[in-house]
From Swiss-Prot:
Subunit description: Monomer. Component of a complex that contains two dimers of PRK, two tetramers of GAPDH and CP12. CP12 associates with GAPDH, causing its conformation to change. This GAPDH/CP12 complex binds PRK to form a half-complex (one unit). This unit probably dimerizes due partially to interactions between the enzymes of each unit.
Localization, UniProt: Plastid, Chloroplast
The species this protein was found in: Arabidopsis thaliana (Mouse-ear cress)
Chain intervals for the UniProt region annotation (Disordered): 90-124
Function: Acts as a linker essential in the assembly of a core complex of PRK/GAPDH. Coordinates the reversible inactivation of chloroplast enzymes GAPDH and PRK during darkness in photosynthetic tissues.
UniProt name for this protein: Calvin cycle protein CP12-1, chloroplastic
Alphabetical keyword list: Calvin cycle, Chloroplast, Copper, Disulfide bond, Nickel, Plastid, Transit peptide
Presequence range in chain numbering: 1-47
One Pfam family of this chain: CP12
InterPro entries: CP12-like (IPR039314), CP12_dom (IPR003823)
A single GO BP: negative regulation of reductive pentose-phosphate cycle
Gene it is expressed from: CP12-1
A GO cellular component entry from the record: chloroplast
Keyword check for Nucleotidyltransferase: no
Recorded superkingdom: Eukaryota
Amino acid sequence: MTTIAAAGLNVATPRVVVRPVARVLGPVRLNYPWKFGSMKRMVVVKATSEGEISEKVEKSIQEAKETCADDPVSGECVAAWDEVEELSAAASHARDKKKAGGSDPLEEYCNDNPETDECRTYDN
């Protein structure tokens, strides 16, 4: 080290500068949950009819009543009624979709007005 003495002032300057070692870090595994071995399973999704949904709603209501009979403020009771609410919403959406005929507004418009530009179809 070099010291400079001027009028009773000592200033020390180091001759070596230390730099931190840069390390290349790999990706964090938490950001890629699909790469975990335990997550490699298939779940088959099946559409249910409106009748099956209404039966499931009735069954879940009975289960919620039985669950809440002992302790109406428990977490299990809240979860049971949440399931009832979700199934009721699914049944309502199924009824609305059935009422609409299962078609989107453009299809309905094209059925009424097939000569418009939006509804033309071209065959090659």
